[in-house]
Amino acid sequence: MAPAALWPQVNGGVEVEFNSSGGSSRLPLAECAAVAFELDCSPVRGFPAFRGQGNYPGLWWFSTTREHVGYESWSERDHLIALDADPAVVGVASQPFRLHWGDGRHHVPDYFVRLSDGTATVLDVRADDRISDADAELFDRSEQACRSLGWAYRRAGVADPVVTANLRWLSGYRHPRVYRPAVAAALEAVFDSARPLMTGVRPVGEAIMVLPVLFHLLWPRRLGVDLSAAVLTEESIVGPALSR
């Protein structure tokens, strides 16, 4: 990454192009710190679709905001699922803006992420083995631009396969219709002390009725389980939410 002393020269001519309810805009970077990209902006570009395409674009129903959010590849989808399950995330925008530099180069980050404390993270998803020197320079420039506004910037590679497998499973129970208040209260009481998953489920009721609610609670981490240790089984240790 370029030394911080060079950031003013790099970022001084940066402009941000985005689409909001008021129309298309292209503003100096310094004027965009307060733009609510996650609330008021549509994607600055679409996803191409053609025969023989090597990636798989689509839409993810983002349970946090109850809106669809786009992804351009399965790798992006996996990271989007993780953002949806993260209780600290309150909003996400796909393809939120295009950064323009004075030398004619430009870049569209994959996601703008708003956190519950009001801070923001800009996310690019690209596997390590798919980053060229030109890509690396654009990611570096993007990080500098974001940091100059107080935003965090992260380039994510391939998501952890075990965590991803668990989140994909739990995501099937993320919809609010799965929630049953009485069952949820009973589960939170029994798992106030950590124990194997099915050991806690059986006293609450029939597994076919109780497990969906348990998975619904594990999705936003209202109950805690180590999703990175192994794929969820009857013996997975479930306990209180880690934030308690």
Predicted feature residues:
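Electrostatic, structured charged patches in enzyme active sites and in nucleic-acid/phosphate-binding
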Residues: 1-244
